[in-house]
Curated annotation (Swiss-Prot):
ATP binds at G90, G92, R93, K113, D125, G126, R176, R183, D262. Mg(2+) binds at N253, D262. The gene is ydiU. The keyword S-adenosyl-L-methionine does not apply. Its cofactor is Mg(2+); Mn(2+). One of its GO terms (molecular function) is magnesium ion binding. This is Protein nucleotidyltransferase YdiU. It catalyses: L-seryl-[protein] + ATP = 3-O-(5'-adenylyl)-L-seryl-[protein] + diphosphate; L-threonyl-[protein] + ATP = 3-O-(5'-adenylyl)-L-threonyl-[protein] + diphosphate; L-tyrosyl-[protein] + ATP = O-(5'-adenylyl)-L-tyrosyl-[protein] + diphosphate; L-histidyl-[protein] + UTP = N(tele)-(5'-uridylyl)-L-histidyl-[protein] + diphosphate.
Length: 485
């Protein structure tokens, strides 16, 4: 029996009507070889922890030999890109290979990114380059390490295939896993194409596969949308709390289950700059860090419009009204945890706001500040105050914070121990990713492997790797990244 036949693999998406996808065979790269295999993730699916002597895995994920249990397909969807509707979207470089169940019985998509041309490639070549593949692998695993809902990366390959972008780069492959690759844009495609029966079918399948709790509801489609609103609010609250800027929040990059999706020109905050723009194509700052909560609502409104044949307008409006309430509640809960506060007090929102104002006015590194604050039990308050130019204002805030901490039952030691579990020491700063990419292009993958290890446990000290927690050099701050992949 084939290795693949021994696993719990299905292809349920391929049973949908053909307006949802096109069957496409992957086009292999030249001399594909493993760069990283995520052994910890592999274990959850009974996949081998070591791939170096496992030719069937290499053959399948490089596209050389497609197992009979796979049904490779390119999904069709649409979406609003920078606010404008584009009907001509779909998987232009990636293929959904199959779905595989983990040890708990949960289904995950196996998706191959960089697999070659599809009918939706438009002017692209269907390839992914090493640079963008490294960025997506590292960031998806970094987000998982931070506890933020995200797609995952099972592995990546490099090759001998040259791919032209601004210049020639190395072709690469990413094996992405997600509970679903269904996006807001899938619903938009069906709605704007007037495929209303198919829109209902997709909604039924999304409920069956991802929101079975909605099956018994009087209004199951509304219940589904309420769940999407809730998960989106939670995801974006997590982004704002950790200082993550996605960079390209088009509706075709929004997961219907609230997972961070499609890592392109992302960035983590260095200095706390609310208006930080990480995408150099975002000339108007539509997707700036401080605009992400607003764009989340805009995107949900676009999805609501696409669901209007199934859900009453008044119900959709009420559901959308809950978004900002949920986002605020989730964000407040997360910030209390980051500050070691267990109880909810009336002045907490002002405490958070004054902290952000102070960080912004003094251009203080956000990750470093939160981590230093987590060590306040073993340092005097001056260590925190010295992070600021305006030490007088910083002293006032720290005193206010310490007064607030006295309302908690936890000791300082216990509070700080909890804070160190939610305030990371290591995040994927863009300059670190760039340094790893430069080395990788020279054949040295050591930084990629070190970062993948550190970012899997970002709250731990890792004393031998302190340099990866250092503040960025001036050239490494405010890096704007291209969408080119």
């Amino acid at each position: 029996m084939s290795f693949w036949n021994s696993l719990s693999i299905t292809t349920r998406y391929s049973r949908l009507p053909r307006c949802f996808f096109t069957y496409v065979q992957p086009t292999p790269l030249d001399n594909s070889r493993w760069l990283i295999w995520n052994s910890e993730l592999a274990k959850q699916f009974d996949l081998p922890e070591n791939v170096h002597n496992h030719s069937e895995l290499l053959d399948a994920f490089s596209g050389e030999v497609v197992p009979s249990v796979f049904a490779p397909l390119a999904m069709k969807y649409a979406g609003h890109q920078f606010g404008s509707y584009n009907p001509d979207l779909g998987d232009g470089r990636g293929l959904l290979l199959a779905e595989i169940k983990d040890k708990k019985g949960n289904s995950f998509d196996l998706h191959l990114k960089g697999a070659g041309l599809t009918p939706y490639s438009r002017s692209g070549d269907g390839r992914a380059v090493l640079r963008s593949t490294i960025r997506e692998y590292l960031c998806s695993e970094a987000m998982a390490g931070l506890g933020i809902p995200t797609t995952r990366a099972l592995g990546m390959m490099t090759s001998d295939t040259p791919v032209f972008r601004e210049g020639y780069e190395t072709g690469a492959l990413l094996i992405r896993m997600a509970e679903t690759h269904i996006r807001f844009g899938h619903f938009e495609h069906l709605f704007y194409s007037n495929l209303l029966e198919e829109l209902k079918l997709l909604s039924d399948k999304v409920i069956e596969w991802h929101f079975p709790c909605c099956l018994g509801e009087d209004k199951p489609y509304l219940a589904m949308f309420n769940n999407i609103v809730d998960r989106t609010a939670y995801m974006i609250a997590q982004w704002q709390a950790v200082g993550f800027a996605h960079g390209v929040m088009n509706t075709d990059n929004m997961s219907i289950i609230g997972q961070t999706f499609d890592y392109g020109p992302f960035g983590f905050l260095d200095d706390y700059e609310p208006g930080y723009i990480c995408n150099h194509s975002d000339y108007q700052g539509r997707y700036a860090f401080n605009q992400q909560p607003r764009i989340g609502l805009w995107n949900l409104s676009a999805l609501a419009h696409s669901l209007s044949p199934l859900i009453d307008k008044s119900d959709l409006e009420k559901a959308l009204e809950q978004y900002e309430i949920k986002l605020h509640d989730y964000f407040s809960q997360l910030m209390r945890k980051k500050l070691g506060l267990l109880s909810k007090q009336e002045g907490d929102t002002r405490l958070f706001e004054s902290m952000f104002e102070l960080l912004s006015q003094n251009t203080v590194d956000y990750t470093r500040f939160m981590r230093v604050l987590s060590d306040l039990d073993s340092q005097d308050k001056q260590t925190v105050i010295d992070l600021f130019v305006d030490r007088e204002a910083a002293t006032l805030w720290v005193d206010l914070y310490l007064t607030r901490c006295k309302l908690e039952a936890d000791s300082f030691d216990m509070r700080c121990s909890k804070m160190r579990k939610v305030n990371p020491k290591y995040v994927l700063r863009n300059y670190l990713a760039q340094q790893a990419i430069v080395k990788a292009n020279e054949g040295d993958f050591s930084d990629v492997k070190i970062l993948s290890t550190l970012l899997a446990s970002p709250f731990d000290e890792h004393p031998d790797f302190e340099r990866y927690a250092e503040l960025p050099p001036e050239w490494g701050k405010r890096m704007e990244i291209s969408c080119s992949s």
